[in-house]
């Protein structure tokens, strides 16, 4: 009976070690493996007129592209309310917005907010896009499976 107990204990220990190794390996997928697992799509809300929030959103977009690979992630930044001000031609972050657009980030302005603030496309940065309603765009993206981020 004493010879059976160490064999059973040893077998149980081996099963436990194998389980831990299997789970640990699965948890340590590389970013490239995660990117190939399916589409990475992120919609970001910027509704604050705070320069810091815009810089944070642009940093998040850059970091997502750096970690996952720009070809492996689709990013859309939706600006509405007070956040729309940073998309105007005189924006303090105009050069960073241009860099993000060049790298493939989609940046859109809410036309409802533009009407409320009496802004025309000629008042805005030339390369941005437009959506009818920023909150509806965010809602629809989430319904389509996009991850939501609000910096």
In which residue ranges do the predicted regions lie?
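Bacterial N-terminal signal peptides that target proteins for export
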Residues: 2-15
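Bacterial N-terminal signal peptides
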Residues: 13-24
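Secreted/extracellular ectodomain signature
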Residues: 25-151
């Amino acid at each position: 009976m004493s010879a059976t107990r160490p064999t059973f204990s040893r077998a149980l220990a081996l099963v436990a070690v194998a389980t831990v190794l299997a789970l640990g390996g699965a948890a340590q997928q590389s970013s490239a493996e995660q990117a190939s697992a399916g589409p990475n799509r992120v919609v970001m809300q910027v509704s604050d007129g705070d320069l810091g929030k815009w810089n944070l959103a642009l940093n998040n977009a850059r970091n997502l592209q750096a970690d996952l690979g720009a070809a492996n992630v689709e990013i859309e930044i939706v600006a509405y309310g007070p956040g729309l001000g940073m998309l105007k031609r005189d924006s303090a972050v105009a050069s960073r917005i241009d860099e993000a657009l060049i790298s493939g980030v989609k940046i859109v302005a809410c036309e409802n907010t533009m009407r409320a603030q009496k802004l025309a496309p000629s008042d805005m940065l030339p390369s941005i896009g437009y959506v009818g309603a920023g909150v509806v765009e965010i809602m629809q993206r989430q319904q389509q499976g996009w991850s939501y981020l609000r910096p």
